């Protein structure tokens, strides 16, 4: 599959990499739309700690897609469902996570930030993202492009509330 990967400051490449394998508790998502964020630009221009030629990172944390494959232990979600995601996955046990504020977790992981993101044909959705409710089903009247910007729109909305 094709993926846009960061290899360091000002070093971003479109490369062919294997489609991610999933386990029985994960989901494989086929990317339909992904938005470019200021964070992606900053990482491209400045690089990211831990990302280099030996440890590249697939960018993209604002995205939507269709479920391609579902692990046998995953409840509710089915192949063909259209979803978008909240990109931050908290540890699930700290006070912030218990309060539902995963984005404030000191040990959070995030698609396209410190784990492979959606500037690729496919994205692996790990079990903790499935369990913690990071996926949201897209209604039929919302396009993938519109769904991909739900996350940045929610950031703006939360800034006003």
Predicted regions mapped to residue ranges:
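Extreme N-terminal starter segment of soluble prokaryotic enzymes
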Residues: 1-2
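Short loop segments at secondary-structure junctions
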Residues: 9, 68-73, 127-129, 141
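Glycine-rich beta-strand-centered segment in the early N-terminal region that forms part
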Residues: 20-34, 48-98, 136-139
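Cytochrome P450 core scaffold surrounding the K-helix E-X-X-R motif
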Residues: 39-45
């Amino acid at each position: 599959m094709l993926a846009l990967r960061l290899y360091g400051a000002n070093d971003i490449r479109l490369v062919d990499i294997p489609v991610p394998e999933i386990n029985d508790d994960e989901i494989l998502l086929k990317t339909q739309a992904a938005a470019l964020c200021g964070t992606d630009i900053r990482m491209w221009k400045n690089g990211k700690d831990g990302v280099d030629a030996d440890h590249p990172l697939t960018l993209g944390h604002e995205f939507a897609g269709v479920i391609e494959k579902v692990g046998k232990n995953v409840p509710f979600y089915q192949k063909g469902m259209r979803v978008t995601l909240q990109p931050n996955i908290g540890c699930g046990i700290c006070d912030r996570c218990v309060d539902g504020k995963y984005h404030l977790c000191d040990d959070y992981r995030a698609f396209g930030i410190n784990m492979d993101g959606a500037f690729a044909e496919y994205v692996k959705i790990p079990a903790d993202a499935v369990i913690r409710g990071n996926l949201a089903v897209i209604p039929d009247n919302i396009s993938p492009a519109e769904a991909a910007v739900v996350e940045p729109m929610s950031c703006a909305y939360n800034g006003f509330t």
